[in-house]
């Protein structure tokens, strides 16, 4: 009787594990980025600077990019459409623009990519020289 019970239990458990859904692929396994962070040197007085990130779907399934969220209103990111479906084996360029008016020094902003594979944070920085112009009083 005990043998039959344990055989039945083993059969039920093996069926349970065989039909379990596969673990979702993590963002680090599904998406490969050309860089996690980018920095631009710009001229004093520049109004803006642009960055590009290239992401490749290295998984065997589509990944949907649901949202791009910049850390502030001076930074914007664009994809061809939202949500954007990135097919298995394909890549896409994410264009990022940072407004620089009135800023000096090293400015760093983040961009959070919300996808079906998880969240990814990218960093953009602009190094704006300090304005060294001096004004003469007459």
Specify the residue positions occupied by each region the protein language model found.
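Sec-dependent N-terminal signal peptides
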Residues: 5-14
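Terminal connector regions
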Residues: 104-133
């Amino acid at each position: 009787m005990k043998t039959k019970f344990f055989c039945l239990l083993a059969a039920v458990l093996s069926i349970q594990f065989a039909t379990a859904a596969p673990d979702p692929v993590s963002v680090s396994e599904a998406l490969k980025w050309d860089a996690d962070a980018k920095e631009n040197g710009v001229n004093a007085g520049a109004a803006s600077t642009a960055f590009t990130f290239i992401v490749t779907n290295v998984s065997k399934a589509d990944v949907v990019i649901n949202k791009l969220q910049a850390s502030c209103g001076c930074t914007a990111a664009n994809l061809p459409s939202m949500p954007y479906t990135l097919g298995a084996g394909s890549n896409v360029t994410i264009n990022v623009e940072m407004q620089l008016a009135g800023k000096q020094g090293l400015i760093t902003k983040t961009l959070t990519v919300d996808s079906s594979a998880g969240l990814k944070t990218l960093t953009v920085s602009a190094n704006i020289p300090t304005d060294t112009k001096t004004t003469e009083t007459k």
